[in-house]
Amino acid sequence: VRTIGIVNVVGSSIAREADATMYTWAGPEISVATTKAYSTQLAACYLLATEFARVRGTLADGQYEHLVTELEALPEKIEKTLADKERIQWFASKYANAKDAFFIGRGLDYAVALEGSLKFKEISYIHSEAFAAGEMKHGPISLVENGTLVVGILTLSLIHISEPTRHA
């Protein structure tokens, strides 16, 4: 078994034990949420997967360049999100008294929901859980009551809600 460590800290136990190491260079984390380390590790995984696909020849012509260009455009997109302070403040003031929050997503968006829920509870101290969207009707929906905050994650336009879920 060959291992690749994706780490932020030079000399960490993973860096020492792995066969190869990718450093993210995120720097020290100030908050408990490890936002920089997580984001840079996600970018490293993306680059690694993209490069593996390029080397294996599984990307169509121009697709590799497009994927790397999209990653390079992230700082500008993050700046736009950060600039939307009024909307963020409006959401926070409207829902700050929520006792519970549920993050839901399907497919890759479920992974975003998991991390979003974790960040939300670590920083806001509001109870939060993440669920796969298709599983909401199998129990978790009974936990949703008046005042519960439900955050739906839908980042891929190719995801469509299935007919049974639409009526749940």
Per-region residue spans from a language model:
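Single conserved hydrophobic/aromatic residue that forms the stacking wall/gate
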Residues: I159-A168
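Active-site phosphate/pyrophosphate-binding segments
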Residues: V10, A20-L149
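Hydrophobic membrane-spanning alpha-helices of multi-pass integral membrane proteins
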Residues: T148-V151, L156
